[in-house]
Amino acid sequence: MNSSHLNIYAATIPDRMHHLDLGLFNYQVTYTRELLKEWCGQIAVDELDNRLARIPRFPGLKIFKNGLENIKRFTADEFRNMMKVFVFVIEGIIKKHHKGTMDANNAKRTDKALVNAYYSWNKMYLCSRQEYFLESELDNFEV
């Protein structure tokens, strides 16, 4: 077999679950926790976990009673459940717990930027779950 003309990208099938749910979103949450710890200390990470644990029960929504303690063992469905609430969970944590690393105005802007990043992620994720796209929807992915 002559593999010099093999296009590996045409030979593989994209797997949204492993790429988006278990890959990128997992990384985004893990990195956010590291940033919170660096900017605000462990108290901000603990508050994030507490907020996740205090989400009221709702049919079909996974409750994270231990926060993100077991994030390495989360399933794609658990990450999708977290996507539904995470934008609300992180809002205000930086404003509340920022240390001397930034002033109040910068903390407010950073907090808002983090919330917007998760909001934009959710919009992109929902769009990517579709089978077919309109040209206008694809324009939203451009930087």
Report each predicted region and the residues it spans.
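General structural signal for alpha-helix termini and helix-helix connectors
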Residues: 88, 92-95, 127-133
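Domain-level detector for long, ordered catalytic/regulatory cores in large eukaryotic signaling
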Residues: 1-85, 92-93, 97, 101, ...
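Alpha-helical bundle/repeat cores within regulatory domains of eukaryotic proteins
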Residues: 100-143
